[in-house]
């Protein structure tokens, strides 16, 4: 970072620490600092603005900037306040944001009401009908949402509260009549139960797949092996950016792989292994295995099998060497994987139920 950038960063930090300007200035400052590489935690330590508040300010600023055609009265209203209100609008489309922002100003909504408005607009966003007398204005869409909830409510107090909420926002006369009708029509329409989320969780490290690039099938030269790009992943779900055309193999996240520096896989003839494999439990012959070699450990180790290259143009060899070799060490062998022996693949796709 240059001296000019250092000075600018210091100036922005000082303004934020002193809370100079409006919330929009604070959001712009936080965004600028994060783009310069400062972490939210570092900004918090220097300014006292907590990371969660930084995110709210930056997001609210983005929402404010998306209200391009908003009336001047709306833009002026949010100039010095309402970052928490605009933050709630982040889940809406650009058109709905503008309508909701205008509604906030007209009805002086607080953050709880804005949260409910956003939920209502999203809930009815996929229903484009006016069969019950509700139009497509933002007020009628919110009114329809509360009308739907009120019809499903057996408790009269809750039903009345929902009707009142709908009447607060509805704009059309027909929509208002539909809501007022519920004051005398106590028919309850059963709610359609929302399905449960298909939630899964990886309970052990080995359940998380570990992707290893595959260099190809032996024989391979050291040049080909070194040309395989190295993978990197992001936490928490180990998302991997894969170059186009790369082959991968998914393995359990065994500790030997997690500790590897730069692993790469090679399909290797079982007959060319430097030691004989023990027989498989099924007694089936093994023609090919998968080797995982760590290119980051390109040094001799008496206790490891090594992948060596007599020359860059010759095929690499797997060997155990009790003495340091004259050939180049390409990597150390991490594991030899035998092919899985699954008697019936269709069984893995069936649901199994067990009685306790």
Curated annotation (Swiss-Prot):
Gene Ontology, cellular component aspect: cytoplasm
Coiled coil: none
Gene Ontology biological-process annotations: carbon fixation; photosynthesis; ribulose bisphosphate carboxylase complex assembly
Stretch list, region C-terminal beta-sheet: 209-342
Principal place of residence: cytoplasm
Pfam families: Raf1_HTH, Raf1_N, RuBisCo_chap_C
Compartment(s) where it occurs, according to its Swiss-Prot or TrEMBL record: Cytoplasm
InterPro entries with a match to the protein in the record: RAF1 (IPR037494), Raf1_C (IPR040858), Raf1_cyn (IPR046382), Raf1_HTH (IPR040781), Raf1_N (IPR041358)
Keyword annotations from UniProtKB, A to Z: Carbon dioxide fixation, Chaperone, Cytoplasm, Photosynthesis
Its job: A major RuBisCO chaperone. Acts after GroEL-GroES chaperonin to fold and/or assemble the large subunit of RuBisCO (ccbL, rbcL). Cooperates with RbcX in RbcL folding, plays the major role in assembly of dimers into RbcL(8)-Raf1(8) intermediate complexes. RbcS replaces Raf1, leading to holoenzyme formation. Required for optimal reconstitution of RuBisCO upon expression of rbcL-rbcS subunits in E.coli. Only interacts with the large subunit (cbbL, rbcL). Probably acts in the final stages of RuBisCO assembly, possibly participating in the addition of the small subunit (ccbS, rbcS).
Subunit structure: Homodimer. Forms an RbcL(8)-Raf1(8) complex. Forms complexes of many stoichiometries with RbcL with and without RbcS. RbcX and Raf1 can bind simultaneously to RbcL.
Name of protein: RuBisCO accumulation factor 1
Organism: Thermosynechococcus vestitus (strain NIES-2133 / IAM M-273 / BP-1)
